[in-house]
Protein backbone atom coordinates (compact mmCIF):
# COMPACT_ATOMS: atom_id res chain seq x y z
CA UNK A 1 0.00 0.00 0.00
CA UNK A 2 1.24 3.49 -0.89
CA UNK A 3 -1.86 5.60 -0.38
CA UNK A 4 0.09 8.83 0.12
CA UNK A 5 1.77 8.42 -3.27
CA UNK A 6 -1.59 7.64 -4.86
CA UNK A 7 -3.21 10.75 -3.38
CA UNK A 8 -0.25 12.97 -4.27
CA UNK A 9 -0.69 11.92 -7.90
CA UNK A 10 -4.44 12.54 -7.82
CA UNK A 11 -3.81 16.00 -6.38
CA UNK A 12 -1.54 16.72 -9.36
CA UNK A 13 -4.01 15.68 -12.08
CA UNK A 14 -4.22 17.91 -15.12
CA UNK A 15 -7.94 18.49 -14.72
CA UNK A 16 -10.05 21.28 -13.17
CA UNK A 17 -10.16 20.64 -9.43
CA UNK A 18 -13.76 21.82 -9.16
CA UNK A 19 -14.81 19.03 -11.53
CA UNK A 20 -13.12 16.30 -9.49
CA UNK A 21 -14.58 14.42 -6.54
CA UNK A 22 -11.87 12.22 -5.03
CA UNK A 23 -13.03 9.64 -2.49
CA UNK A 24 -11.03 7.19 -0.39
CA UNK A 25 -13.10 4.22 0.75
CA UNK A 26 -11.56 2.65 3.86
CA UNK A 27 -12.65 -0.98 3.77
CA UNK A 28 -13.29 -2.60 7.18
CA UNK A 29 -10.53 -0.58 8.88
CA UNK A 30 -8.89 -1.87 12.05
CA UNK A 31 -7.47 1.53 13.03
CA UNK A 32 -7.64 5.21 12.13
CA UNK A 33 -4.39 5.41 10.14
CA UNK A 34 -6.09 5.87 6.76
CA UNK A 35 -8.46 8.52 8.12
CA UNK A 36 -5.48 10.38 9.60
CA UNK A 37 -3.59 10.26 6.31
CA UNK A 38 -6.53 11.41 4.20
CA UNK A 39 -7.06 14.37 6.53
CA UNK A 40 -3.84 15.83 5.08
CA UNK A 41 -5.59 16.20 1.70
CA UNK A 42 -8.34 18.84 1.93
CA UNK A 43 -9.81 18.02 -1.49
CA UNK A 44 -10.17 14.30 -0.74
CA UNK A 45 -13.25 12.84 0.92
CA UNK A 46 -12.97 9.92 3.32
CA UNK A 47 -15.64 7.30 3.89
CA UNK A 48 -15.78 3.89 5.54
CA UNK A 49 -17.24 0.67 4.16
CA UNK A 50 -17.48 -1.68 7.16
CA UNK A 51 -18.30 -4.77 5.11
CA UNK A 52 -15.03 -6.48 4.16
CA UNK A 53 -14.43 -6.97 0.46
CA UNK A 54 -13.27 -4.86 -2.47
CA UNK A 55 -16.60 -4.96 -4.28
CA UNK A 56 -18.41 -3.75 -1.16
CA UNK A 57 -15.95 -0.82 -1.17
CA UNK A 58 -16.54 -0.14 -4.87
CA UNK A 59 -20.28 -0.12 -4.29
CA UNK A 60 -19.83 2.34 -1.43
CA UNK A 61 -17.91 4.59 -3.81
CA UNK A 62 -20.77 4.42 -6.33
CA UNK A 63 -23.22 5.57 -3.65
CA UNK A 64 -20.96 8.35 -2.36
CA UNK A 65 -19.69 9.77 -5.67
CA UNK A 66 -21.34 12.82 -7.20
CA UNK A 67 -20.14 12.73 -10.79
CA UNK A 68 -21.57 11.26 -13.98
CA UNK A 69 -18.34 9.32 -14.61
CA UNK A 70 -16.79 7.16 -11.89
CA UNK A 71 -13.11 6.19 -12.19
CA UNK A 72 -11.64 3.51 -9.93
CA UNK A 73 -8.05 2.87 -8.92
CA UNK A 74 -6.15 1.23 -6.04
CA UNK A 75 -3.88 2.41 -3.25
CA UNK A 76 -0.79 0.83 -4.88
CA UNK A 77 -1.24 2.90 -8.04
CA UNK A 78 0.13 6.28 -9.15
CA UNK A 79 -1.98 7.98 -11.82
CA UNK A 80 -0.44 9.90 -14.69
CA UNK A 81 -1.27 13.61 -14.72
CA UNK A 82 -3.44 13.13 -17.83
CA UNK A 83 -5.34 10.10 -16.51
CA UNK A 84 -8.75 11.67 -15.93
CA UNK A 85 -8.53 13.91 -19.00
CA UNK A 86 -7.92 10.83 -21.19
CA UNK A 87 -10.83 8.96 -19.59
CA UNK A 88 -13.18 11.90 -20.14
CA UNK A 89 -11.99 12.23 -23.73
CA UNK A 90 -12.65 8.57 -24.46
CA UNK A 91 -16.20 8.81 -23.13
CA UNK A 92 -16.78 11.96 -25.17
CA UNK A 93 -15.46 10.31 -28.34
CA UNK A 94 -17.52 7.14 -27.84
CA UNK A 95 -21.06 8.06 -26.76
CA UNK A 96 -22.08 4.39 -26.63
CA UNK A 97 -19.27 3.52 -24.20
CA UNK A 98 -20.22 2.61 -20.66
CA UNK A 99 -16.71 1.61 -19.59
CA UNK A 100 -13.20 2.92 -20.25
CA UNK A 101 -10.07 1.07 -19.17
CA UNK A 102 -6.51 2.26 -19.48
CA UNK A 103 -2.85 1.36 -19.65
CA UNK A 104 -1.17 0.02 -16.50
CA UNK A 105 2.62 0.07 -16.47
CA UNK A 106 4.98 -0.93 -13.65
CA UNK A 107 5.92 1.81 -11.22
CA UNK A 108 9.21 0.02 -10.67
CA UNK A 109 10.98 -3.18 -11.68
CA UNK A 110 13.51 -3.45 -8.89
CA UNK A 111 13.16 -7.10 -7.89
CA UNK A 112 13.10 -10.45 -9.73
CA UNK A 113 9.48 -10.94 -8.66
CA UNK A 114 8.44 -7.68 -10.31
CA UNK A 115 10.25 -8.61 -13.52
CA UNK A 116 8.59 -12.04 -13.49
CA UNK A 117 5.15 -10.50 -13.15
CA UNK A 118 5.74 -8.47 -16.31
CA UNK A 119 7.09 -11.56 -18.11
CA UNK A 120 4.02 -13.50 -17.00
CA UNK A 121 1.75 -10.94 -18.66
CA UNK A 122 1.54 -7.99 -16.30
CA UNK A 123 -1.31 -5.50 -16.58
CA UNK A 124 -0.31 -3.80 -19.84
CA UNK A 125 -2.72 -4.17 -22.76
CA UNK A 126 -0.92 -2.28 -25.50
CA UNK A 127 -0.60 1.26 -26.80
CA UNK A 128 -3.51 1.52 -29.26
CA UNK A 129 -7.03 2.62 -28.47
CA UNK A 130 -9.53 -0.17 -29.03
CA UNK A 131 -13.31 -0.18 -28.93
CA UNK A 132 -15.14 -3.42 -28.11
CA UNK A 133 -18.83 -4.04 -28.63
CA UNK A 134 -21.09 -7.03 -29.12
CA UNK A 135 -23.47 -6.86 -32.07
CA UNK A 136 -27.16 -7.68 -31.54
CA UNK A 137 -27.63 -11.45 -31.50
CA UNK A 138 -23.96 -12.19 -30.78
CA UNK A 139 -22.86 -14.13 -27.71
CA UNK A 140 -20.78 -11.91 -25.44
CA UNK A 141 -19.27 -15.00 -23.86
CA UNK A 142 -18.24 -16.53 -27.17
CA UNK A 143 -16.75 -13.30 -28.50
CA UNK A 144 -15.33 -11.61 -25.40
CA UNK A 145 -15.53 -14.04 -22.47
CA UNK A 146 -11.86 -13.58 -21.61
CA UNK A 147 -12.38 -10.08 -20.25
CA UNK A 148 -8.92 -9.81 -18.74
CA UNK A 149 -7.75 -8.62 -22.17
CA UNK A 150 -9.57 -5.33 -21.60
CA UNK A 151 -7.75 -4.15 -18.50
CA UNK A 152 -7.88 -4.36 -14.74
CA UNK A 153 -9.70 -2.87 -11.78
CA UNK A 154 -6.73 -0.64 -10.97
CA UNK A 155 -7.67 1.52 -13.96
CA UNK A 156 -11.30 1.47 -14.99
CA UNK A 157 -14.12 3.99 -15.29
CA UNK A 158 -17.88 3.77 -15.88
CA UNK A 159 -20.80 6.02 -16.56
CA UNK A 160 -22.91 6.26 -13.41
CA UNK A 161 -26.05 5.46 -15.40
CA UNK A 162 -24.70 1.99 -16.15
CA UNK A 163 -24.85 0.99 -12.48
CA UNK A 164 -28.41 2.30 -12.21
CA UNK A 165 -29.37 0.20 -15.22
CA UNK A 166 -27.35 -2.99 -14.73
CA UNK A 167 -26.58 -3.07 -11.01
CA UNK A 168 -23.48 -2.61 -8.88
CA UNK A 169 -20.48 -4.88 -8.35
CA UNK A 170 -21.04 -8.41 -7.07
CA UNK A 171 -19.81 -8.47 -3.43
CA UNK A 172 -19.14 -12.21 -3.70
CA UNK A 173 -16.23 -11.45 -6.03
CA UNK A 174 -12.75 -9.95 -5.64
CA UNK A 175 -10.23 -9.25 -2.89
CA UNK A 176 -11.44 -9.82 0.65
CA UNK A 177 -13.71 -12.73 -0.32
CA UNK A 178 -13.06 -16.43 -0.96
CA UNK A 179 -12.81 -15.67 -4.69
CA UNK A 180 -9.90 -13.21 -4.32
CA UNK A 181 -10.67 -11.57 -7.66
CA UNK A 182 -12.95 -11.37 -10.67
CA UNK A 183 -15.06 -8.33 -9.79
CA UNK A 184 -13.57 -6.21 -12.55
CA UNK A 185 -13.75 -9.05 -15.09
CA UNK A 186 -17.41 -9.66 -14.36
CA UNK A 187 -18.30 -5.98 -14.71
CA UNK A 188 -16.46 -5.73 -18.04
CA UNK A 189 -18.51 -8.69 -19.25
CA UNK A 190 -21.71 -7.10 -18.00
CA UNK A 191 -20.95 -3.94 -19.98
CA UNK A 192 -20.43 -5.87 -23.21
CA UNK A 193 -23.40 -8.16 -22.71
CA UNK A 194 -25.62 -5.11 -22.22
CA UNK A 195 -24.78 -4.01 -25.77
CA UNK A 196 -22.72 -1.02 -24.65
CA UNK A 197 -19.18 -0.33 -25.83
CA UNK A 198 -16.02 -0.78 -23.79
CA UNK A 199 -13.04 1.42 -24.72
CA UNK A 200 -9.41 0.64 -23.97
CA UNK A 201 -7.64 4.01 -23.90
CA UNK A 202 -3.86 3.75 -23.34
CA UNK A 203 -3.54 7.51 -22.82
CA UNK A 204 -5.36 6.93 -19.51
CA UNK A 205 -2.19 5.63 -17.89
CA UNK A 206 -1.37 4.64 -14.33
CA UNK A 207 1.68 3.06 -12.71
CA UNK A 208 1.23 0.01 -10.50
CA UNK A 209 3.61 -1.14 -7.80
CA UNK A 210 3.96 -4.88 -8.35
CA UNK A 211 4.62 -7.35 -5.53
CA UNK A 212 8.28 -7.15 -4.60
CA UNK A 213 8.85 -10.66 -3.21
CA UNK A 214 8.38 -14.03 -4.84
CA UNK A 215 6.01 -15.51 -2.26
CA UNK A 216 3.59 -12.59 -2.70
CA UNK A 217 3.82 -12.95 -6.48
CA UNK A 218 3.01 -16.66 -6.32
CA UNK A 219 -0.01 -15.92 -4.13
CA UNK A 220 -1.18 -13.26 -6.59
CA UNK A 221 -0.86 -15.62 -9.55
CA UNK A 222 -2.81 -18.32 -7.69
CA UNK A 223 -5.50 -15.76 -6.85
CA UNK A 224 -5.67 -14.79 -10.52
CA UNK A 225 -6.69 -18.36 -11.28
CA UNK A 226 -9.24 -18.42 -8.47
CA UNK A 227 -10.73 -15.08 -9.47
CA UNK A 228 -10.95 -15.87 -13.17
CA UNK A 229 -12.74 -19.18 -12.69
CA UNK A 230 -15.02 -17.65 -10.06
CA UNK A 231 -15.99 -15.09 -12.70
CA UNK A 232 -16.68 -17.89 -15.21
CA UNK A 233 -18.86 -19.76 -12.71
CA UNK A 234 -20.75 -16.60 -11.77
CA UNK A 235 -21.39 -15.74 -15.42
CA UNK A 236 -22.53 -19.27 -16.26
CA UNK A 237 -24.94 -19.27 -13.32
CA UNK A 238 -26.32 -15.79 -14.03
CA UNK A 239 -26.72 -16.06 -17.81
CA UNK A 240 -27.77 -19.57 -18.91
CA UNK A 241 -27.46 -18.55 -22.57
CA UNK A 242 -23.73 -17.93 -21.99
CA UNK A 243 -23.11 -21.19 -20.12
CA UNK A 244 -21.71 -23.15 -23.07
CA UNK A 245 -19.36 -20.31 -23.98
CA UNK A 246 -18.08 -20.12 -20.40
CA UNK A 247 -17.49 -23.88 -20.29
CA UNK A 248 -15.56 -23.76 -23.57
CA UNK A 249 -13.47 -20.86 -22.34
CA UNK A 250 -12.74 -22.63 -19.07
CA UNK A 251 -11.62 -25.80 -20.83
CA UNK A 252 -9.43 -23.82 -23.23
CA UNK A 253 -7.90 -21.90 -20.34
CA UNK A 254 -7.14 -25.01 -18.32
CA UNK A 255 -5.55 -26.95 -21.13
CA UNK A 256 -4.24 -24.76 -23.93
CA UNK A 257 -3.28 -21.71 -21.86
CA UNK A 258 -1.66 -23.62 -19.02
CA UNK A 259 -0.08 -26.32 -21.18
CA UNK A 260 1.57 -23.65 -23.31
CA UNK A 261 2.91 -21.94 -20.21
CA UNK A 262 4.12 -25.22 -18.76
CA UNK A 263 6.03 -25.83 -21.98
CA UNK A 264 7.63 -22.40 -21.68
CA UNK A 265 8.63 -23.17 -18.11
CA UNK A 266 10.48 -26.27 -19.31
CA UNK A 267 12.33 -24.36 -22.02
CA UNK A 268 13.07 -21.31 -19.86
CA UNK A 269 12.79 -22.40 -16.21
CA UNK A 270 14.59 -19.36 -14.80
CA UNK A 271 12.65 -16.81 -16.81
CA UNK A 272 9.31 -18.58 -16.37
CA UNK A 273 9.22 -20.67 -13.16
CA UNK A 274 7.02 -23.74 -13.32
CA UNK A 275 5.67 -23.25 -9.81
CA UNK A 276 3.98 -20.01 -10.93
CA UNK A 277 2.16 -21.85 -13.71
CA UNK A 278 1.17 -24.63 -11.32
CA UNK A 279 0.02 -22.08 -8.75
CA UNK A 280 -2.36 -20.53 -11.29
CA UNK A 281 -3.51 -23.96 -12.45
CA UNK A 282 -4.31 -25.02 -8.88
CA UNK A 283 -6.05 -21.71 -8.33
CA UNK A 284 -8.17 -22.29 -11.43
CA UNK A 285 -9.48 -25.61 -10.12
CA UNK A 286 -10.06 -24.02 -6.72
CA UNK A 287 -12.04 -21.22 -8.36
CA UNK A 288 -14.57 -23.69 -9.74
CA UNK A 289 -16.01 -24.11 -6.26
CA UNK A 290 -15.16 -20.80 -4.60
CA UNK A 291 -17.94 -18.65 -6.02
CA UNK A 292 -20.74 -20.60 -4.35
CA UNK A 293 -18.92 -20.41 -1.01
CA UNK A 294 -18.32 -16.71 -1.54
CA UNK A 295 -21.99 -16.04 -2.24
CA UNK A 296 -22.86 -17.61 1.10
CA UNK A 297 -20.17 -15.53 2.78
CA UNK A 298 -21.43 -12.32 1.15
CA UNK A 299 -24.97 -13.12 2.30
CA UNK A 300 -23.68 -13.60 5.86
CA UNK A 301 -21.86 -10.27 5.68
CA UNK A 302 -24.99 -8.55 4.38
CA UNK A 303 -27.00 -9.95 7.30
CA UNK A 304 -24.41 -8.83 9.87
CA UNK A 305 -24.46 -5.32 8.45
CA UNK A 306 -28.11 -5.22 7.42
CA UNK A 307 -28.46 -1.56 8.44
CA UNK A 308 -25.93 -0.58 5.76
CA UNK A 309 -27.30 0.45 2.34
CA UNK A 310 -26.50 -2.07 -0.38
What would you call each of these model-derived segments?
Residues 74-78:
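The conserved acidic donor/metal-binding loop of glycosyltransferases
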Residues 82-123:
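Conserved donor NDP-sugar-binding/catalytic core segment of glycosyltransferases
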Residues 33-35, 49-65:
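Glycine-rich, basic loop-to-helix element that forms the pyrophosphate-binding segment
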Residues 220-226, 240-310:
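Non-catalytic, C-terminal membrane-associated alpha-helical segments of glycosyltransferases
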Residues 149-167, 172-204:
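A short, conserved alpha-helix in the catalytic core of glycosyltransferases
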Residues 70:
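Short aromatic/hydrophobic "clamp" motif used to bind/position activated sugar donors
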Residues 121-148:
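Short, flexible, basic/aromatic active-site loop/helix in glycosyltransferases
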Amino acid sequence: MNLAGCLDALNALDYPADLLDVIVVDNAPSDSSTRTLVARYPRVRYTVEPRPGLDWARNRAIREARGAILAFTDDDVVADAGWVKAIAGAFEDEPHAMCVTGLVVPDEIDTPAQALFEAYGGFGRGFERRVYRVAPGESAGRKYGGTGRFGTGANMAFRREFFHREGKFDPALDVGTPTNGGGDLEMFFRVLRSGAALVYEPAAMVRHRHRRDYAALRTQIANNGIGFFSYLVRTAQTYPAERAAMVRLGVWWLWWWHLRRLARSIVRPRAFPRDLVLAELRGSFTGLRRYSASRRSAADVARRFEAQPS
